[in-house]
A protein has these predicted regions:
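Long, contiguous hydrophobic alpha-helical segments, chiefly transmembrane helices and signal peptides
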Residues: 16-22, 26-30, 46-52, 79-82, ...
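FAD/FMN-dependent oxidoreductases across multiple families
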Residues: 99-220
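Generic alpha-helical structural element
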Residues: 15, 19, 101-105, 178, ...
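Short secondary-structure transition/capping segments
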Residues: 30, 89-98, 169-177, 241-259, ...
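Glycine-rich, flexible loop segments associated with nucleotide phosphate handling
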Residues: 7-12, 159, 246-252
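C-terminal helical "tail/cap" subdomain of flavin- and related membrane-associated enzymes
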Residues: 190-319
Length: 319
C-alpha cells in the first residue's frame, strides 16, 4: 500500500475482501496478472440526473399521497424523491439515453425545476413555496447491471480473495438495492469463512451461494430494465400508441400486474408482501406464494389500469 505522497508499506493478511464498489481496481489488477474474469454486463440505457433541495423554514414534508406519488414512471421519465435529514431531500430523474432533446434541456437547473414542477407528485416537494435548491442539476451515465465471475469452471481466479457487493454484482441504482445486496453478500461471505477453512473450497462455495442468494435479485432487476427500455423506445416512436401485450399469456400477465399495483395501494397484506421483496427481506416474488396475496389481488382485476397510472405531463407537453 502507498499513501498519497508517502512511503510504500506491505501488509500481509490471511484474506483480502474487495469492497471497492463498481470502480474497484482489483479486477483489472488480477486481469493484468493473467487471470480470466468473465463478466455479464447489460446497459440500462438511462442517464440519471439529480438535484438536492431543502424545505423552506416552517414547511413540513408533504404527506404521502397514493394519488400523487413522489416516485413513478411516465415511460419517458422515471422520477423519485429521496428524503434526508433536517429538511434536505434529493429528486432524481432518469431518462433514456436517446432522448437527446430532453437530456440537453434537463442539464439546465431552471429547466430541471420546471420539469419537476410539472409532475404533481414532485411539485408537492419542489414548488417555489415549498423548497429551495441547494445544488445545481447533475447527472451520471454508464449505468449497467454487471456480474463478475471470480470462479470459472470451478477454478478460482485467486485464492483468499473475495469481491463483495458492487465489486462483484451490481444492478441499476434506480432500484436502490446496492446496499442491501452488499449486506446480504457480506453475510454470505462471513458464513462461508466461518464454516470452511480450505481457501479453494471457500472460493467455490462462496461463488455457489452468491448465485443462490443474488442471482434472483439480479435477474428481476435486469428484467425490469428490459421492460423499461422497451417502453421508452416505443414512446419515442409514438407515445399515443404504446405497445400492447401480444398473446393470451402476456395479456393475462399485464392484467394481473395492473391489479397487483392497485392492490399494493389499497390492501395492507399485499403491500406488506410487496415491501418484503422491495426491501430484499426475501427473494423477488416470494410473497406471491402466499394464497392470500393471490386472492386479494384477484379482486382488483380490471380495476388496476387507469387507477394505477402515474399523474404527469405527456412527453409532447414536456418537449
Amino acid at each position: 500500500l502507498k499513501q498519497r505522497g508517502g512511503e510504500s508499506e506491505q501488509l500481509l493478511a490471511d484474506i483480502v475482501v474487495d469492497a471497492g464498489g463498481r470502480n474497484s481496481k482489483q479486477r483489472d489488477r488480477l486481469r493484468d496478472t493473467g487471470a480470466t474474469i468473465e463478466s455479464e454486463v447489460d446497459d440500462a440505457e438511462i442517464i440519471y440526473y439529480t438535484r438536492h433541495y431543502k424545505l423552506l423554514p416552517g414547511v413540513e414534508e408533504p404527506e404521502r399521497d397514493p394519488a400523487e406519488p413522489s416516485t413513478g414512471d411516465l415511460g419517458f421519465i422515471k422520477f423519485g424523491v429521496f428524503p434526508g435529514d433536517g429538511g434536505h431531500f434529493a429528486v432524481i430523474v432518469c431518462i433514456h439515453r436517446e432522448e437527446t432533446e430532453l437530456l440537453e434541456a434537463i442539464r439546465d437547473s431552471e429547466t430541471y425545476d420546471r420539469i419537476c414542477r410539472s409532475i404533481p407528485g414532485l411539485n408537492r416537494w419542489v414548488a417555489e413555496d415549498k423548497a429551495e435548491a441547494t445544488t445545481g442539476s447533475f447527472g451520471f451515465s454508464d449505468i449497467h447491471a454487471a456480474w463478475h465471475h471470480y470462479v470459472t469452471d470451478k477454478k478460482p481466479v485467486a485464492l483468499n480473495y473475495f469481491a463483495v457487493g458492487d465489486a462483484a454484482v451490481r444492478t441499476n441504482p434506480l432500484y436502490g438495492r446496492g446496499c442491501s445486496t452488499g449486506i446480504i453478500h457480506a453475510h454470505v461471505l462471513a458464513k462461508v469463512l466461518d464454516e470452511i477453512s480450505s481457501p479453494h473450497d471457500r472460493a467455490i462455495v462462496f461463488d455457489q451461494r452468491t448465485e443462490e442468494e443474488l442471482r434472483p435479485i439480479f435477474k428481476a432487476s435486469l428484467a425490469d430494465d428490459k421492460k423499461a427500455i422497451k417502453r421508452a423506445r416505443a414512446m419515442m416512436v409514438d407515445e399515443t400508441n404504446p405497445p400492447t401485450p401480444k398473446g393470451a399469456r402476456n395479456r393475462l400477465q399485464t392484467l394481473f400486474g395492473n391489479a397487483m399495483r392497485e392492490a399494493t395501494r389499497k390492501d395492507i397484506h399485499v403491500l406488506r408482501g410487496a415491501m418484503r421483496t422491495v426491501n430484499l427481506m426475501e427473494k423477488p416474488g416470494e410473497f406471491m406464494k402466499d394464497w392470500r396475496v393471490i386472492a386479494r389481488t384477484l379482486r382488483f382485476i380490471g380495476r388496476g389500469d387507469g387507477g394505477s397510472r402515474v399523474l404527469g405531463p405527456s412527453r409532447g407537453e414536456i418537449l
